[in-house]
């Protein structure tokens, strides 16, 4: 498995890895951001809102029906961090085309790009308040739940202690106060 790289634009690179070992395919789209206290959680917030719907599939139900049509393909948000930069984006996983009618990969990529480039917006050009509020509620619940999960809490404390003074020590999802202060127009 040797990766190949292709620069599509000055700011967009494509990395592919061909293998016959798996029956599934994976596609990810990510942005690289600096580990800044407000930028990291707000960027994650944006991806959580994007995942709630797009023009073509405006509700979670319609998105899920489309994913079911694609042989139960899955789209999730991911966050990778390192020293000096963080990556945030979508990861799509689907059954390999050789095991289907051959259109699952293309359909999943199309759906992912609809979510990114044709998001569900209100008449002012902002994310809909319903999707922003639902994403905010989910993120805040997730932040609050860390204290009740010993493994997540230990990992959080590890990052805070190990990387004190570095961007990596910042809470990846932010704080409840920060997330509650973010408005739809800021996103």
Model-derived features: positions:
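Histidine-acidic residue clusters that define the catalytic metal-binding segment
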Residues: 1-7, 157-187
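Glycine-rich, mobile lid/loop segments that gate access to catalytic sites or pores
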Residues: 139, 143-147, 158-162
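N- or domain-start disorder-to-order transition segments that initiate the globular core
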Residues: 1-26
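A generic secondary-structure signal for well-formed alpha-helical elements
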Residues: 53-54, 116-120
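Catalytic Zn2+-binding segment of zinc metalloproteases
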Residues: 51-59
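Acidic/histidine-enriched alpha-helical segments
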Residues: 64, 118-144
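Active-site SXXK
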Residues: 43-52
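M16 family metallopeptidases and their MPP-like homologs
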Residues: 17, 23-43, 60-114, 151-174
């Amino acid at each position: 498995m040797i990766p190949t790289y292709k620069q599509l634009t000055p700011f967009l690179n494509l990395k592919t890895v061909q293998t016959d070992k798996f029956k599934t395919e994976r596609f990810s789209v990510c942005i690289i951001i600096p580990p800044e206290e407000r930028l990291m959680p707000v960027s994650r917030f944006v991806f959580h809102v994007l995942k709630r719907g797009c023009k073509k599939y405006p509700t979670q139900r319609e998105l899920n029906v489309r994913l079911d049509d694609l042989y139960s393909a899955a789209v999730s948000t991911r966050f990778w961090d390192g020293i000096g930069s963080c990556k945030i984006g979508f990861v799509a996983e689907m059954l390999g085309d050789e095991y289907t009618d051959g259109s699952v990969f293309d359909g999943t990529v199309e759906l992912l790009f609809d979510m990114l480039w044709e998001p569900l917006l209100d008449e002012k050009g902002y994310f809909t308040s319903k999707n922003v509020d639902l994403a905010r509620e989910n993120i805040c619940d997730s932040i609050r739940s860390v204290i009740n999960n010993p493994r997540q809490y230990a990992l959080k404390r590890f990052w805070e202690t190990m990387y004190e003074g570095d961007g990596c020590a910042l809470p990846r999802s932010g704080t409840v106060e920060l997330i509650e202060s973010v408005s739809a127009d800021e996103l």
